[in-house]
Amino acid sequence: MGAPTINVLISSLNYRNQLALTLSLFALSNVLMFFSHSFLGALIARFIGGLMHGVILVIATIICFKFAPKAKKSMALSLVSIGFTTAMMVGVPLGILVSRRFGLLMPFLLVACLAFLAALLTLFTMPKFSSEPAKFKSLSVSFGSAPVWQGFFVAALSWGSVFVVHVYLRVLLERCHFSPENIANIYLCHGIAATLGVLFGGKLADLRGLFAALSFLLTMQILALGAMSFSYHLSKMFLIASVIAYSFFGYACIAPIKMLGGHLARLFTPTTMSSTIVLHEVSLFKGIALGSFVGGLSVHYLGVHFNGICAALLALCALLILTFGIKKSVFAKNSKVAPSHH
């Protein structure tokens, strides 16, 4: 709950200053980690860094919702998601490379420099987008609307299904006797497919509409994740194809899921829209924790080749909530506010 709390505390600042402040604090946390020589110091540094990481993504998403042109809103969200995806895919191997050449703590100093640079660019290039001061009680308003908290579940379950597989993908590939070189190449294809998927998801939502796009992408995600479990017993090429498919369709859901949060906030909690968007973004992080936990249970009790089926079940739950919960509520709400033709 760090991101919603900090968002309320800094809501009196304009969005440019909010983003610059959180980036600076994120950089300072990594500087502290670099110079830390105790477990307590490292723990404090990582705690601050974790808080700021969530807030940065939330602020970027809110800016997209409030200030991007309506026709380009999905693409703006896709670009934010691409930054997040690229950082995940490139950051780990880059950090390993830097730590091997310059020492274990050097990646933290590199991250601090990049974060300070981003903060400076924010101050000198971003307009002063105004922000409405928020209150802690506004966070509770979001949970009073069933479609809104159903949206939280869709976000957590959909994104969680990706991480059931993602966290233990290397274990699966090693069990299937892939060499380290082949695993590295598969991860490269995984990253490329994820990046293309993010762009595709945003474009599809613009062309076909939010609900049609998200329903299609979740369906394809379920099929791709389920195929991963069956591919364990088939050829290696089939497994590689299923990994690429799950990467593409799993990450393609990001932009439509973010759009879903904004749409539900605007429709059901218009007076506390920013707070609802914040909580919707937090649901994605909860999904990461949920997916990692479910994936670990699957590996321990069933075997890593069952992770795909477990992930598909989470995505199926998200699709059912979207279809039989949120869509009905949204259509009912729209029919009430629609003008009469009689």
Q: Which residues fall in each region the model found?
A:
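Conserved MFS/SLC helix-loop-helix module at the cytosolic interface between two early adjacent transmembrane helices
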Residues: 1-37
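Helix-breaking motifs and short loop linkers at transmembrane-helix boundaries and internal kinks
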Residues: 14, 35-41, 52, 231-233
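Paired small-residue
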Residues: 29-32, 40-49, 237-245
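Cytoplasmic helix-loop-helix junction between adjacent transmembrane helices
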Residues: 39, 45-83
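Intracellular juxtamembrane helix-capping segments at the cytosolic ends
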Residues: 55-68, 252-268
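Extracytoplasmic gate region of multi-pass secondary transporters
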Residues: 148-198
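C-terminal transmembrane helical hairpin of 12-TM major facilitator-type secondary transporters
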Residues: 212-257
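A late C-terminal transmembrane helix in Major Facilitator Superfamily
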Residues: 264-301
